[in-house]
């Protein structure tokens, strides 16, 4: 009888081909945050996913905590858009408000939730691109400082991580 042990030959091979275990404690749930009050709107392209106004975030936070989800990644949907995506880096923007709300909500319950903020300008710009446009192209040198301003605004609000998705 021949037993093939080549995938168990070394620690590196064993780690590489070991079973992967996924549980809620390793997952991050996306949350889309909109301006306004008392809003919970379905995201048509993502069944079971909703856009929440800040005042309704407690509902989804409770669900995440009950399921044992490790954290959330916040995506902002601004009320107004402009050419430079200024809503992304406003300290009173929808994402910084959501970060502060979630941190306070969890602290009041003696719980923790990892809060990650998406750092991208495309949702905040009137043209839908992830940066400043010059002659129809994204100008990286002009855009990077705006991404940095957004990341700093989220950090000031209390985000545990920022995640550039541009």
What are these regions, as identified by a protein language model?
Residues 22-49, 113-138:
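N-terminal small/glycine-rich loop or linker at the start of catalytic domains
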Residues 12-22, 54, 58-68, 96-111:
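Short amphipathic alpha-helices and their capping/turn segments at secondary-structure boundaries
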Residues 40-52, 67-95, 161-166:
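Glycine-rich, proline-tolerant flexible connector loops at the mouths of alpha/beta enzymes
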Residues 26-30, 71-73, 112-116, 153, ...:
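Structural preference for beta-strand elements that scaffold enzyme active sites
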Residues 31, 57, 64, 118, ...:
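Conserved, mostly hydrophobic/aromatic
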Residues 82-119:
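Alpha-helix-loop-beta-strand connector modules within alpha/beta enzyme cores
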Residues 54-62, 142-152:
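Short, acidic/polar
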Residues 95-100, 136-148:
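Acidic, His- and aromatic-enriched active-site or binding-groove loops in soluble protein domains
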């Amino acid at each position: 009888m021949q037993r093939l042990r080549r995938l168990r030959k070394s620690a590196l091979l064993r780690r590489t081909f070991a079973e992967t275990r996924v549980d809620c404690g390793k997952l991050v749930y996306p949350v889309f945050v909109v301006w306004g009050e008392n809003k919970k709107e379905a995201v048509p392209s993502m069944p079971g996913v909703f856009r929440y106004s800040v005042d309704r975030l407690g509902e989804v936070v409770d669900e995440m905590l009950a399921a044992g989800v490790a954290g959330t990644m916040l995506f902002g949907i601004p009320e107004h858009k402009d050419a430079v995506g200024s809503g992304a880096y406003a300290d009173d923007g929808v994402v910084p408000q959501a970060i502060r709300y979630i941190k306070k909500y969890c602290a009041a319950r003696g719980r923790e939730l990892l809060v990650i903020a998406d750092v991208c300008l495309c949702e905040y710009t009137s043209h839908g691109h992830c940066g400043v446009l010059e002659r129809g192209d994204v100008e990286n040198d002009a855009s990077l400082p705006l991404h940095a301003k957004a990341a700093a605004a989220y950090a000031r609000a209390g985000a545990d991580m920022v995640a550039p998705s541009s």
